[in-house]
Amino acid sequence: QAATIEALLGPQDSVGEMTAEFERRRDYVMERLAEIPGVTCAAPRGAFYAFPNVSEHYRRTLDGSTIGGSLDLAEYLLEKALISLVPGEAFGAEDYIRISFATSMEALDKGLTRLKDALA
């Protein structure tokens, strides 16, 4: 309980810094997702993940894998592009995947480059 009080009433400098950093990461992810044909995404406003619609890539065959939905796509991306993300199916949103940006800019750059290449 004491930690909660300190978190709420103590210095808030780090909160502003982290908010700015997550906004920077969010903006970067949105910019990179916009470069990928067949992917659309509304900007997240209160979370540290993006939820892009990737349904235009369903019914495609990518590197020998037929993509039937978000689970197939997530498995393909994990196996072929070494990208870990969450299929939208887990949230009742089959047309989407969830991508966290609670990681380093370097990891985001690498992952988004791999995503773009895998869906090309």
Regions found by a protein language model. Name each.
Residues Q1-A120:
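PLP-dependent class I/II
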